[in-house]
Amino acid sequence: MTVPLDRIRNFSIIAHIDHGKSTLADRLIQRTGGLTDREMSAQVLDNMDIEKERGITIKAQTVRLDYKAKDGQDYVLNLMDTPGHVDFAYEVSRSLAACEGALLVVDAAQGVEAQTLANVYQSIEHDHEIVPVINKIDLPAAEPDKVKAEIEDIIGLPADDAVLASAKSGIGIDEILEAIVARIPAPKGDPAAPLKAMLVDSWYDPYLGVVILIRVVEGTIRKGQQIKFMQADTVHLVDRVGCFRPKIEQLGEMGPGEIGFITAQIKEVSQTAVGDTITDARKPTAEPLPGFKEVQPVVFCGLFPVDAADFEKLRESLYKLRLNDASFSFEAESSAALGFGFRCGFLGLLHLEIIQERLTREYDLDLITTAPSVVYRLHLSHSKTEDAKVIELHNPADMPDPNRIDMIEEPWIEATIYVPDEYLGSLLKLCQDRRGIQKNLTYVGGRAQITYELPLNEVVFDFYDRLKSISRGYASFDYHQIGYREGDLVKMSIMVNGEPVDALSMIVHRAAAEARGRHMCERLKDLIPRHLFKIPVQAAIGGKVIARETIAAMRKDVTAKCYGGDATRKRKLLEKQKEGKKRMREYGNVNIPQEAFIAALRMGDEG
């Protein structure tokens, strides 16, 4: 039995990290009787440990709440818990497209932040009804009136009827539920039309196979039905239809406006693309839903096991993670310095950190991560054997012959940064140093909102950490890609004892190459232990060395056992030592410890 359309409310919660989104979701579940107090654990919807610890939501989750409103009617409220971080922007856009409205949760002490803004604008684009909720009003530092003014000034939403709440103390929860029923519109859709449903998310369950989260737009979906994924062009048989309350409950069928899950004996998440349209295989709908796009990795880096024997374990672990997260890619690669490993592609830096942390934590692996790099476009001129063409470069070590390169293009982003006035100067300097182009600067209350265009290459390294450190953690930052532009870029190689170390090679802007190279050489000089012979550490572009440091040799005092007597005896011993050192330098291997790699890749303030 499907639920009548006018009794359904689909909504998401938009909030910046730590503004209380998951806690509010917990309270709503508790208030509507989804779980008893005993079963309630903090952050019910955040399943991964990392999600709970970092206080972030990575995968979209959903829960169906039954609520008896004050008008005496029973309503079904579907809450979509969306990721709040910029790396998962596409997942957010699909989750928002599955709803008709949103709760905008803003911390009463901290006010509106950059990520909130990005998601609110997406929500407004979907024509959502937005209900502002000012959370944490019981904090001593809470300033609800100031935050209301911020919501009106920055976002342009009327905030006089914002709900004041404290999810932690349970204040204002009933008012929020009533506001959802009264202000968020009911979904539309024709139950008799051919099935059209949106694939919102999918994850792998060891018992059920791939579980697919869907929002039915038109028609009905039931057990035993043959369905077709329109983008993937595959046909499957539905063997389960259900919803989360948040415990799994099986349903016979789902109609328009309903959100729930299906399973269809699918083995790999990679077959289920987020945003795909699901329809009836026998009676398909004419048009797929708009807005689908392939998720492309943005940041690439190499992952190598510290112990070479862990290579197979790393491969298995990556396959297992891939079951749950089709948005990252990997392929095997080998490096002279680090042995065998994988070149992995991620949606952004947070995504990279999360995958890395899950590998260390859940699969107990010790890993070395090479410098993150972005995808460059190389325009190659024609040679005797090949025509002119454009190629994508993921790994600086694969750079072709510089003489063939006509032009290198790099990805650029538009960043929106909020920062308190007193840190504005150092923030502008940081953006300037990173080749940023200032587009806009406005003041809201005591904070500046700055819009900058920046090369993504300059941001992936340590921009976020520097931003947080110069603003004492008060700045918030959000970005989106704006396409490729030509750049004066060169490949910088690091050579130790005349041998290039491929794991440390990187693509840099020509103007910054010398400073970056000098910094890297100084760093390695301190990190590589002394050997019995002199070791030159050089940074080079092509054949030209742009920076050099020398690690002095350890010296054994060979003349210690000579007492007085003839000076030629001493000279003979010293000459012999000199010969030995020369031979050693030619054939000796320099042992670079793993810590040196990791520390060298973490550029400091001067980088």
Curated annotation (Swiss-Prot):
It comes from the Bacteria. GO terms for molecular function: GTP binding; GTPase activity; guanosine tetraphosphate binding; ribosome binding; translation elongation factor activity. GO terms for biological process: positive regulation of translation. Keywords: Cell inner membrane, Cell membrane, GTP-binding, Hydrolase, Membrane, Nucleotide-binding, Protein biosynthesis. InterPro entries: EF-4, EFG_III/V, EFG_V-like, EFTu-like_2, G_TR_CS, LepA_C_sf, LepA_CTD, LepA_IV. Gene3D superfamilies: 3.30.70.240, Elongation factor 4, C-terminal domain (3.30.70.2570), Elongation Factor G (Translational Gtpase), domain 3 (3.30.70.870), P-loop containing nucleotide triphosphate hydrolases (3.40.50.300), Translation factors (2.40.30.10). GTP binds at residues 18-23, 135-138. It is found in: Cell inner membrane. One of its GO terms (cellular component) is plasma membrane. It catalyses: GTP + H2O = GDP + phosphate + H(+). Its EC number is 3.6.5.n1. It is a peripheral membrane protein. Residues 6-188 form the tr-type G domain. Required for accurate and efficient protein synthesis under certain stress conditions. May act as a fidelity factor of the translation reaction, by catalyzing a one-codon backward translocation of tRNAs on improperly translocated ribosomes. Back-translocation proceeds from a post-translocation (POST) complex to a pre-translocation (PRE) complex, thus giving elongation factor G a second chance to translocate the tRNAs correctly. Binds to ribosomes in a GTP-dependent manner. PANTHER family: TRANSLATION FACTOR GUF1 HOMOLOG, CHLOROPLASTIC, TRANSLATION FACTOR GUF1-RELATED. Belongs to the TRAFAC class translation factor GTPase superfamily. Classic translation factor GTPase family. LepA subfamily. This is Elongation factor 4.
